[in-house]
């Protein structure tokens, strides 16, 4: 055996041994005991034919150490930067909207990395992308991970992207270490987690979870340029018949577990100096659209007692949302009036129409729905008191919250402990594809800190160290789940 070949062979064995020790021998061995490490080392030397100390590796990405079980942080950051270049807005912002040219370029980039890793790649009718590493028992439900790469206008380059590129780096780590999965491992790039183009959050994962309602509504869905969903998909290379949407639906036994790596999008981990967040539940939002109609008129000629102001009705409802949310008595209940539009929108014209969009979230579905009902009653009362017409009060979506599965939480906690990383059990208050994957698979999420909790803005940032920690926890958790 040539020296270089022997070194590579030993490197793989060393990585497998390190992973074996971290995983507890995959058969109940006590993790971290000197006897286990020594036994693994002796096995490596026996197979390689020369002492393990002969191997020296650079660790990759500046991480150091002789084990192939490392994160190539430099390579991961480079990929994040390259993916960010596929944007319809100037640096440092990222804008990547569903089925746009930049979205298509990003998809090609992700598939290119999957191909380099030797994953088998498939795409469904709406463009969810799957890269699978076949396990030794491929008939078993797979262990999946992944996230999204679409980006709202003028946002940052880490939201979702860390969960896709980081997942691919986790697969690369496991392959490099010599790990052999029992259950197949799969990385998913979900289509349109953001609602930017068609007003539908988590479009791809929602369909994967079997949403008949969404499949029906997409037949009539258009964007703000009156381009239909199917025409937009066709322009990106996804030509389909409406009935093909049912082919996107997955069965509950397709996946044994799903784990998503994501930046926190909040300040808690950074503020408390904790490296890993283990998500126990995802708060589900309800979206509401409200419209009032009044008489309008000239801002100077119509006296105050004679006015039926649709704008003031909207303003009063916005305050009512805040009031009812605070009355819930729970810190986990939040409400946001994210859109308030007035017509005709002139400084010297009394608004004749107002349009309000409201987001209410909670991990307790009953409590959240109670807030929504109170907001509805307030809208009715405001309409009567102000003499305006409540022309629409429509609940756009009202998704149930999701709890992380105990088995996935256990795997994530195990991984963090083995890596000596402090972790915190926490709730996700942001929407994620995991919310819908929980309908078809045991689910869990790994959070890493992000700078000042910033997200959906150009200042969004996660450090290489924090990303590496998240990737390592993901890799170990997936490996453990794969062997079950």
Curated annotation (Swiss-Prot):
InterPro entries: Amidase_Cbmase, Bact_exopeptidase_dim_dom, Peptidase_M20. Belongs to the peptidase M20 family. The record marks 307 as: Necessary for dimerization. It is an enzyme of class 3 (hydrolase). This is Ureidoglycolate hydrolase. Residues 284-399 are annotated as: Involved in dimerization. One of its GO terms (molecular function) is hydrolase activity, acting on carbon-nitrogen (but not peptide) bonds, in linear amidines. It is found in: Endoplasmic reticulum. Pathway: Nitrogen metabolism; (S)-allantoin degradation; glyoxylate from (S)-ureidoglycolate: step 1/1. PANTHER family: ALLANTOATE DEIMINASE-RELATED (PTHR32494:SF19).
């Amino acid at each position: 055996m040539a020296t270089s070949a022997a070194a590579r062979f030993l490197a793989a064995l060393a990585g497998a041994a390190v992973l074996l020790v971290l995983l507890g021998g995959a058969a109940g061995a006590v993790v971290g005991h000197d006897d286990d490490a020594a036994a693994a080392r002796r096995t490596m030397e026996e197979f390689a034919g020369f002492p393990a100390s002969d191997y020296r590796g650079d660790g990759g990405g500046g991480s150091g150490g002789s084990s192939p079980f490392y994160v190539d942080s430099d390579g991961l950051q480079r990929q994040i930067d390259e993916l960010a270049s596929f944007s319809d807005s100037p640096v440092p912002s990222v804008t990547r909207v569903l089925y746009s040219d930049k979205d298509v370029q990003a998809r090609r980039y992700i598939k290119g990395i999957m191909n380099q890793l030797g994953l088998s790649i498939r795409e469904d009718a709406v463009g969810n992308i799957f890269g699978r590493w076949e396990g030794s028992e491929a008939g078993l439900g797979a262990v999946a991970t992944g996230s999204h790469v679409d980006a709202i206008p003028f946002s940052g380059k880490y939201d979702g992207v860390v969960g896709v590129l980081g997942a691919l780096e986790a697969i690369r780590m496991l392959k490099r270490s010599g790990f052999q999965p029992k259950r197949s491992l799969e990385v998913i790039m979900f289509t349109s987690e953001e609602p930017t183009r068609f007003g539908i959050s988590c479009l791809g994962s929602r369909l994967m979870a079997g949403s008949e309602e969404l499949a029906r509504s997409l037949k009539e869905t258009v964007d703000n340029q009156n381009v239909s969903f199917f025409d937009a998909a066709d322009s990106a290379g996804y030509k389909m018949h409406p009935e093909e949407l049912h082919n996107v639906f997955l069965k509950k036994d397709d996946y044994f577990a799903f784990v998503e790596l994501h930046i926190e999008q909040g300040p808690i981990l950074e503020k408390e100096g904790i490296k890993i967040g283990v998500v126990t539940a995802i708060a589900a939002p309800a979206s509401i659209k409200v419209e009032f109609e009044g008489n309008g008129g000239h801002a100077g000629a119509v006296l105050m007692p004679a006015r039926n102001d649709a704008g003031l009705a909207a303003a009063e409802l916005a305050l009512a949302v805040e009031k009812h949310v605070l009355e819930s008595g729970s810190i986990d209940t939040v409400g946001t009036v994210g859109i308030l539009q007035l017509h005709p929108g002139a400084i010297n014209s009394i608004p004749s129409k107002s349009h309000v969009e409201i987001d209410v979230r909670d991990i307790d579905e009953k409590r959240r729905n109670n807030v929504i009902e109170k907001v509805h009653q307030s809208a009715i009362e405001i309409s009567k008191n102000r003499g305006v017409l409540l022309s629409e009060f429509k609940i756009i979506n009202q998704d149930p919250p999701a709890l992380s599965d105990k088995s996935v939480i256990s795997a994530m906690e195990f991984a963090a402990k083995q890596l000596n990383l402090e972790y915190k059990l926490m709730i996700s208050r942001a929407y994620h594809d995991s919310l819908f994957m929980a309908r078809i698979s045991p689910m869990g999420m790994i959070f890493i800190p992000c700078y000042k909790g910033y997200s959906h803005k150009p200042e969004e940032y996660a450090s290489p160290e924090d990303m590496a920690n998240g990737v390592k926890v993901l890799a170990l958790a997936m490996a453990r789940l794969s062997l079950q």
